[in-house]
């Protein structure tokens, strides 16, 4: 019987990719001020920002669209778009002022060559640009941080000043042999200025500046900066402790100072992207005296402090352990006036029944407080879904706002005056934009959602969640009784299920998870006729802290066994073609995939690995997160000592490279040459070992790409090559 897979021509796959990749993704939303019409009606504008792949320009474009939401104070009466979308070129950050009358925009302009790109901070009011400041020309600091780790753009409550984070201005450096020609017609003062020894430091042009790792290259020493909107004067704040790097800052009550998160950078910086375990604390620096005050425990890790509307309390996430790299967090509350800190929501060791399984988001939304400053709203993974929750900060109760829905996943974009803006999607439904009012306390489950922007469901994609219990011989002795889940996508109504091939995708991390949200690659594969199995093995987030802690020391074993067990169970229950199973994984998902083709070579006909971890031992000295190597191998990390021989041996023993002699599955490797997280030499090590043994292997090396391989040109090329690899080795 002919196999029911849409792989007969590469052009068909390219056309399908071109169509599905046009689905835009929501990146941000903000709410305008309340407006009352002459007839007494009330409405607010919703400003949304989106991104979309542009295959003609080979870049991600950003655009905005506005909507009007008419309401009666408790529910939405009418909502709809206000005009078409507009591309926003060059915008790095933007923020509405507290009153909504002004908007600050950080914009890049100029060329793309070194030193050609400039940054401008603009202030807009109504229908005009009120101010524009050339930050690059002012030379008060280096480039402004626009990332979500350190970056911020915060209006003072008085709307007279703007707070942001930028790279500290570096001293000029020149060669020992640099000479300057003196103008004989210059004045004595000008000649003296040119001769000043402090104009440039000789011999420092090649001094190494340590940065914050993957996706944070050139970000080394952040400083807090304040712009006086009226005068244009920029001040770099003093008083920040020298041993920490500041970020995520906002104005304290009364504008008397600034609250910020400070990350320790001694004795050296570790990669911070996707690592919520970096030692950090909450600080307050007084603008008048320059005194800096510690507001939280300084031995833990914190993130995303958010000031309540009444300016009395600060809520933030706190991670009670510096290992592993991501985990269940506490929700903490700091009272500004009593100086008392309390834990509102604690770490959840294990989910009981359908109860709350803990907080796993890495950042709280910028707008997360209810109007009465009593409740906090956020989204978090709960097993294989992502739901919205409201927490009563007085009593600590957690209530789901989206439980009992259709099984998809939610993301909160913002909440203001109890009006929530959220995103909803499923594996077969691209993101839709919704608004709804937060009900009064005790009635949170009765949110009435109204769609602002609907998306068309993608036909012929069926999906569901499978709960899996490891067999007794695979139980974790210390953390017994843990289950895990997998999300299964399959083509709608195939003529013969036994002819359907399956692609298995373990996630990276390892402490992350798949949720039932829109994902381009799985949807593409499913539309081509593949069943796609997304496995949340033990160690994934969303299943309780015990599940996360069960994996360090057991990588290469527990995670691999879980994925293999999931594959065998699904093949047995669904009767897919067991002779046509392939693997596709990136980072730790690539680590698991390469383990599987070594430990279970008879199961898999093809494998695609993106920036995989191959040899934990050899990665230790080159990655931006050496602590990951040690901790996941099962040992405590210390920055002041090297592992002993037994630790090196254990790291090697838990690595896919150990199983090279058994590998016979054809492998496609995709590596980013600028990857700081899993340096591309990891994949090269595996490539050479397979070539030596005549195993079919192909290597794609993307020169300017990083760990995620997410650049539009790279992403599209890697997908098409993956499809062709599957076509070649699974057969069409």
From Swiss-Prot:
Principal cellular location given in the protein's record: cytoplasm
Annotated localization: Cytoplasm
N-acetylmethionine modifications at: 1
Phosphoserine: residues bearing it: 185, 187
Tissue expr: Expressed in erythrocytes (at protein level).
Gene Ontology MF: a single term: omega peptidase activity
Subunit architecture: Homotetramer.
Protein name, entry field: Acylamino-acid-releasing enzyme
Native source organism of the sequence: Homo sapiens
């Amino acid at each position: 019987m002919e196999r029911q897979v849409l792989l007969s021509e590469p052009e068909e796959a390219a056309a399908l990719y071109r169509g599905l990749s046009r689905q835009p993704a929501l990146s941000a939303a903000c709410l305008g001020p309340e407006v009352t019409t002459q007839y007494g009606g009330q409405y607010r504008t919703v400003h949304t920002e989106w991104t979309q792949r542009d295959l003609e320009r080979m870049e991600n474009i950003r655009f905005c669209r506005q909507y009007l939401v008419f309401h009666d104070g408790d529910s939405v009466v009418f909502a709809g778009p206000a005009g078409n979308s507009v591309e926003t070129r060059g915008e790095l950050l933007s923020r509405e002022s507290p009153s909504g009358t002004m908007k600050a925009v950080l914009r890049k302009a100029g060329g793309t060559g070194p030193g050609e790109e400039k940054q401008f901070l603009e202030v807009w009011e109504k229908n005009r640009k009120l101010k524009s400041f050339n930050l690059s020309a002012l030379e008060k600091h280096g480039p402004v941080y626009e990332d979500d780790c350190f970056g911020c753009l915060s209006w003072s409550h008085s709307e007279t000043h703007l707070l942001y984070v930028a790279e500290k201005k570096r001293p000029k450096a020149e060669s020992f042999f640099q000479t300057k020609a003196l103008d004989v017609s210059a004045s004595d003062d000008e000649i003296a200025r040119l001769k000043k020894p402090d104009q440039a430091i000789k011999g420092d042009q090649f001094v190494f500046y340590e940065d914050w790792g993957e996706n944070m290259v050139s970000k080394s020493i952040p400083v807090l900066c304040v712009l006086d909107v009226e005068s244009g004067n920029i001040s770099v704040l003093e008083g920040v402790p020298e041993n920490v790097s500041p970020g995520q800052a906002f104005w304290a009550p009364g504008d008397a100072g600034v609250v910020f998160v400070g990350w320790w950078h001694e004795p050296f910086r570790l990669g911070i992207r996707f690592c919520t375990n970096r030692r950090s604390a909450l600080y307050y620096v007084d603008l008048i005296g320059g005194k800096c005050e510690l507001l939280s425990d300084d031995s833990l890790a914190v993130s995303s402090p958010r000031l309540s509307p009444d300016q009395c309390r600060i809520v933030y996430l706190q991670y009670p352990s510096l290992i592993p790299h991501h985990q269940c967090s506490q929700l903490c509350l700091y009272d500004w006036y009593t100086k008392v800190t309390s834990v509102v929501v604690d770490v959840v060791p294990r989910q009981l029944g359908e109860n709350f399984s803990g907080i796993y988001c890495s950042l709280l939304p910028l707008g997360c407080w209810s109007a009465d400053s009593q409740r906090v709203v956020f989204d978090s993974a709960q097993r294989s879904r992502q739901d919205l929750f409201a927490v009563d900060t007085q009593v600590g109760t957690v209530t789901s706002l989206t439980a009992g829905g259709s099984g998809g996943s939610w993301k909160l974009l913002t909440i203001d005056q109890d009006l929530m803006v959220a995103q909803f999607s499923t594996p077969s439904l691209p993101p839709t934009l919704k608004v709804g009012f937060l009900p009064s306390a005790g009635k949170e489950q009765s949110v009435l959602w109204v769609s602002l922007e609907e998306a068309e469901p993608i036909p012929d994609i069926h999906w569901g969640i499978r709960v899996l219990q490891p067999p007794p011989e695979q139980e974790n002795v210390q953390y017994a009784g843990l289950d895990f889940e997998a999300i299964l996508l399959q083509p709608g109504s195939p003529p013969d299920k036994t002819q359907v091939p399956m692609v298995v995708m373990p996630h990276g991390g390892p402490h992350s998870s798949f949720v039932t949200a829109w994902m381009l690659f799985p949807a593409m594969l499913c539309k081509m006729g593949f069943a796609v199995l997304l496995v949340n093995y033990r160690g994934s987030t969303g299943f309780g802290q015990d599940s996360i802690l069960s994996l360090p020391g057991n990588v290469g074993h527990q995670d691999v066994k879980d994925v293999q067990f999931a594959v065998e169970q699904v093949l047995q229950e669904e009767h897919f073609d067991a002779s046509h199973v392939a693997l596709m994984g990136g980072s730790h998902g690539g680590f698991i995939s390469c383990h599987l083709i070594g430990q279970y070579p008879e199961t898999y006909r093809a494998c695609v690995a993106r920036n995989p971890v191959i040899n934990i031992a050899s990665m230790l000295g080159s990655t931006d997160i050496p602590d990951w190597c040690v901790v996941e191998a099962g040992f405590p990390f210390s920055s002041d000592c090297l592992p002993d021989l037994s630790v090196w041996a254990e790291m090697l023993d838990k690595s896919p490279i150990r199983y090279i002699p058994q590998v016979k599955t054809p492998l496609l490797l995709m590596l980013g040459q600028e990857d700081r997280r899993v340096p591309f030499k990891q994949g090269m090590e595996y490539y050479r070992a397979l070539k030596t043994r005549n195993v079919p292997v192909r290597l794609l090396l993307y020169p300017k790409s990083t760990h995620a391989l997410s650049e539009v040109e790279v992403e599209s090329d890697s997908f098409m090559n993956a499809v062709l690899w599957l076509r070649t080795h699974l057969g069409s």
